From Swiss-Prot:
The keyword Nuclease is annotated on this UniProt entry: yes
Protein's UniProt name: Ribonuclease HII
Keyword Manganese included in the entry's annotation: yes
Lineage: Bacteria, Thermotogati, Thermotogota, Thermotogae, Thermotogales
Superkingdom in the source lineage: Bacteria
Enzyme Commission identifier(s): 3.1.26.4
Length: 224
């Protein structure tokens, strides 16, 4: 039991009442969405930063959290990441997670810094190592995002999404170079954009070439 994480949350609960932990998964990836979770955790579980847990342990804790806590989920798509940038898309996902939880008077503990969300709270650097609620949110967000990436591995089998989950591994970068990016990739990210051309953008979007996302990518290509 990581009691120090619950003691950290207890301080905020004593001062502000209900506390929501918020975290995201997938911010640094080259493909797929950003997934955020908002968690109200009232029972003590053996939670910790999802990055320091095995996949099996994350799955076990995910089920425990979903069965014993109040959970909200928010997703920002690759299209939204390209349109609004990764920082703003992360805020969109987190605000959606909070909105789905619908606890407007609760106090938010969010992992990170300088994130102004839709309700009162505080940003905590390395919050997933300090707060039980944030740690629980990190587990939920990570597990759900991993499942999304595994599902898309069946749609785009050349890229190995089930293995690297969209991160910029050597295998993934080689696949992007060999097969070209997909609409599931974050086309505005430099390692992806560098493998695009005007023709490839037209091929990707075909009849939707006049959509805002295509226009953004074409502008980036022309200025690169």
């Amino acid at each position: 039991m990581r009691s120090e994480l619950f003691a950290y949350d207890r301080f905020y609960k004593q001062n502000f009442g209900t506390v929501i932990g918020v975290d995201e998964a997938g911010r640094g990836c080259l493909a797929g969405p950003v997934v955020a979770a908002a968690v109200i955790l009232e029972v003590q579980l053996d939670v910790f930063d999802s990055k320091q847990l095995t996949a099996q342990k994350r799955e076990e804790l995910f089920l425990q959290i979903m069965n014993s806590a109040e959970v909200g989920i928010g997703i920002a798509t690759p299209e939204e990441i390209d349109l609004y940038n990764i920082f703003n898309a992360t805020k969109i996902a987190m605000n959606r997670a909070l909105a789905s939880l619908n606890k407007k008077d609760a106090y938010v503990l969010v992992d990170g810094k300088s994130l102004n969300l839709s309700q009162q709270g505080v940003c905590i650097v390395k919050g997933d190592e300090k707060s039980a609620s944030i740690a629980a949110a990190s587990i939920v967000a990570k597990v759900l995002r991993d499942r999304i990436m595994v599902a898309h591995d069946r749609i785009y089998p050349c890229y190995g999404f089930s293995k690297h989950k969209g991160y910029g591994t050597v295998h993934h970068l080689n696949a992007i170079r060999e097969f070209g990016p997909t609409v599931f990739h974050r086309l505005s990210f430099s390692p992806v954009l560098s493998n695009l051309s005007v023709k490839k953008v037209h091929d990707l979007f075909s009849e939707n070439i006049n959509c805002e996302r295509a226009k953004v990518i074409l502008r980036k290509l022309s200025s690169s």
